[in-house]
Amino acid sequence: MKQSINIQDQFLNQLRKENTFVTLYLLNGFQLRGLIKGFDNFTVLLETEGKQQLIYKHAISTFVPQKNVSIELE
């Protein structure tokens, strides 16, 4: 049986590995900008100006990277 592809994990991992600057839009409209330093099933660790913020994924609406991210869909 073929393993299902987890696009979210691939996307976040590429952002982390390539140190791609990202803007996070929260559900309340607030914007956070920085680098993804890590993530798990429930949270994203964002670093902004040397400070870390742990954001719960359920509070995030959208990730907007500064440049396009390459992921494998097959």
UniProtKB/Swiss-Prot annotation:
- UniProt superkingdom: Bacteria
Arranged from A to Z, the UniProt key words for this protein are: RNA-binding, Stress response
| One Pfam entry name | Hfq
Q: Which GO terms describe its biological process?
A: regulation of DNA-templated transcription; regulation of RNA stability; regulation of translation, ncRNA-mediated
Disulfide pairs here are: none
Presence of keyword RNA-binding: yes
Glycoprotein recorded as keyword: no
A Gene Ontology molecular function term of the record: RNA binding
- Return the GO cellular component terms, semicolon-separated: cytosol
> Which stretches make up the Sm domain?
9-69
Q: Which family does it belong to?
A: Belongs to the Hfq family.
According to its UniProt entry, the function of this protein is described as: RNA chaperone that binds small regulatory RNA (sRNAs) and mRNAs to facilitate mRNA translational regulation in response to envelope stress, environmental stress and changes in metabolite concentrations. Also binds with high specificity to tRNAs.
Q: How does it assemble?
A: Homohexamer.
Protein name, UniProt field: RNA-binding protein Hfq
Q: Which organism is it from?
A: Bacillus cereus (strain ATCC 14579 / DSM 31 / CCUG 7414 / JCM 2152 / NBRC 15305 / NCIMB 9373 / NCTC 2599 / NRRL B-3711)
Name of the gene this protein is made from: hfq
